[in-house]
């Protein structure tokens, strides 16, 4: 890797570099290559391949913003003359890398697809805050704009149904409030034991309001 970095810097017009700069370049290039090859492995798995194919590599380079035409210039520096097979393959990939593979192409004609899905034109009305290097917006049939505020119902039948549903919810909430406010019966075993202990000690049960309240609170409702 040091030799590759030195060759690149020499082509850019640098004659020498320090050890610290070399270490920084090696670390940066190593990190970049690891992340790039990890993305290539993901594209290969998504294509259900065990080994990256030419299509996978072409798609990977396009996503990295590396044009296929630049590879031919780099290969000409090290392969002189460039083999015709490699040259033809690069030309073919440069022209077909953006095309849809035949296995994913629709069997319907474009007119029928337009009738089924609507307009397939890509919206180019890019807002000012969208930078240019981002991909274009998808076709209009792939997403649907939803209103921010819900539309109020206008049908009388639907309004009556919603009112009935809300009244039932209110009635259910009132019943729960009334059930909670009803006094609970003090028939728990703990309360009976408490009354027995008070009678044995000649104490008045009504004088222990806090204990009596707690026993009523935690008694199970029947």
From Swiss-Prot:
- Protein's UniProt keywords contain DNA-binding: no
* Keywords from the named record: Nucleus, Transcription, Transcription regulation
* GO annotation (BP), single: transcription initiation at RNA polymerase II promoter
**UniProt xrefs under InterPro entries:** Histone-fold, TAF8, TFIID_su8_C
**A Pfam family matched in the record:** TAF8_C
Under the heading CDD domains, the entry gives:
HFD_SF, TAF8
Tell me which GO cellular component terms the UniProt record holds: transcription factor TFIID complex
- Where in or outside the cell? Nucleus
| Primary location recorded for the protein, binned into one broad class | nucleus
MF (Gene Ontology): protein heterodimerization activity; RNA polymerase II general transcription initiation factor activity
The answer to whether keyword Nucleus applies is yes
Q: Would you identify the family this protein belongs to, as annotated?
A: Belongs to the TAF8 family.
The subunit structure is:
TFIID is composed of TATA binding protein (TBP) and a number of TBP-associated factors (TAFs).
| Role description | Functions as a component of the DNA-binding general transcription factor complex TFIID. Binding of TFIID to a promoter (with or without TATA element) is the initial step in pre-initiation complex (PIC) formation. TFIID plays a key role in the regulation of gene expression by RNA polymerase II through different activities such as transcription activator interaction, core promoter recognition and selectivity, TFIIA and TFIIB interaction, chromatin modification, facilitation of DNA opening and initiation of transcription.
Which PANTHER family does the annotation name? TRANSCRIPTION INITIATION FACTOR TFIID SUBUNIT 8 (PTHR46469:SF1)
- What protein name does the entry list? Transcription initiation factor TFIID subunit 8
Organism of origin: Schizosaccharomyces pombe (strain 972 / ATCC 24843)
């Amino acid at each position: 890797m040091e030799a590759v970095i030195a060759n690149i810097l020499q082509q850019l017009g640098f004659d020498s570099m320090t050890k610290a700069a070399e270490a920084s370049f090696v670390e940066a290039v190593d990190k970049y290559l690891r992340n790039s090859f990890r993305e290539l492995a993901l594209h290969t798995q998504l294509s259900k391949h065990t080994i990256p194919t030419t299509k996978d590599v072409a798609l990977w380079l396009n996503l990295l913003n590396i044009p296929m035409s630049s590879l031919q210039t780099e290969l000409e520096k090290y392969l002189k003359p460039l083999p015709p097979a490699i040259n033809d393959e690069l030309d073919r990939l440069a022209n077909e890398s953006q095309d849809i593979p035949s296995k994913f192409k629709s069997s319907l004609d474009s007119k029928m697809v337009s009738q089924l899905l609507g307009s397939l034109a890509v919206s180019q009305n890019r807002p000012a805050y969208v930078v240019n290097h981002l991909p274009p917006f998808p076709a209009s049939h792939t997403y649907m704009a939803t209103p921010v505020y819900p539309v109020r119902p206008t049908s009388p039948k639907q309004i009556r149904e919603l009112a009935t549903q809300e009244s039932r919810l209110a009635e259910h909430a009132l019943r729960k409030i009334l059930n909670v406010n009803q006094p609970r019966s003090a028939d728990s075993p703990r309360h009976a034991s408490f009354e027995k202990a008070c009678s044995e000690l000649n104490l008045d049960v009504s004088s222990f309001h806090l204990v009596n309240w707690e026993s009523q609170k935690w008694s199970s409702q029947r």
